[in-house]
Amino acid sequence: AAEVVGAGQLVEIRSAHIDGCLHHGDGGVEFAERLADGGGRVAVDTTLNVGALDLLHPGKVRAGAHKTDMARRQMAAYVRMGAEPTFTCAPYQVGHLPGMGEQVAWGESNAIAFVNSVLGARTERYGDFLDACCALTGRAPLYGLHQEENRAATVVVDASRVPAAPKERVVFYPVLGHWLGLQ
């Protein structure tokens, strides 16, 4: 993967968020199960994006038995590899908050934007399969937003005069982002 994106080396990561947990076809299930059946284990803290099955209300999912079974198997395979079954597109809202400058490999576009801009951690957009490979190896290609020279802001918002208490609330940054977007 590093070669494909022109990265000369890999970088150690602290966490991963696997976007490829959502069932789009049997190939994704086969990939995840092959890794799990082969003894694959995540090397770093790893969260999972939403799956194609509501595990709390599986009867409300309008899919045939085959698709329901495949979705469940895909989700279960990643859990067997040691990923935390967060099943959310916003892992930062359930306690996963990488620190400033921390190297991570996250899939899911909103999480990537949040991690890179609000938290100041570093990730590229890792799609299905590559996100899992990063989680399993604890490494990601060193390119793009992982590198300092590619992290130049075009807009800087100074929130230093905002008291600390509101900034500690989970809703602060989404509300700030919404308000800024209206400007």
Locations of the language-model features?
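Non-transmembrane, aqueous-exposed alpha-helical and coiled segments at domain scale
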Residues: 1-183
